[in-house]
Design a protein with these regions (language model features):
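Short amphipathic alpha-helical interface segments
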Residues: 50-62
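Short alpha-helical segments that sit at the start of domains
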Residues: 27-53
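General nucleic-acid-binding
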Residues: 1-24
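Basic amphipathic alpha-helical segments that dock to polyanions
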Residues: 69, 84-91
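A short, conserved structural fragment
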Residues: 91-98
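Short acidic, hydrophobic short linear motifs in intrinsically disordered regions
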Residues: 63-71
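Short, cationic-aromatic polyanion-contact patches
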Residues: 42-49, 65, 98-121
Length: 121
């Protein structure tokens, strides 16, 4: 099961996590792969949180096109394309090009089964 961890960390904290993991690898300790998206500014994190319903709709309904997703979420296609592009840039979703009913369509796809938030107080 692939789990995505979403967190708010500074660049220094991410680097420390990387060093800790590199030391474990050098010692030969194998861990389960960890997929994490860390935000270093609150604006991007808030944008992610605001658009969780879109991510959830992609995971649950597995739409065959952006247009179908727009109908499911009751959002404008142009606004939805911006959200999808944001998610794709941070690596949360992949957009595949597929042929549906004779037309080339963009199909958003989430590769994770679960999204977890890890927030420090």
């Amino acid at each position: 099961m692939k789990r995505l961890i979403v967190s708010c960390k500074t660049a220094d904290q991410v680097f420390e996590d990387f060093k800790r993991t590199a030391k474990k690898v050098q010692r030969g300790v194998r861990q389960e792969p960890q997929y994490e998206v860390s935000f270093d500014n609150k604006a991007d994190f808030n944008r992610f949180v605001r658009n969780i319903p879109v991510l959830s709709a992609i995971m649950v309904f597995k739409p065959r096109s952006v247009y179908e997703l727009a109908k499911l979420t009751h959002q404008d296609v142009s606004n939805l394309n911006k959200v999808i592009q944001f998610f794709e840039e941070i690596g949360v979703i992949r957009v595949k090009t597929a042929r549906h009913a004779g037309r080339m369509v963009k199909q958003p796809h989430v590769e994770y089964n679960e999204v977890t938030f890890r927030l420090a107080a």
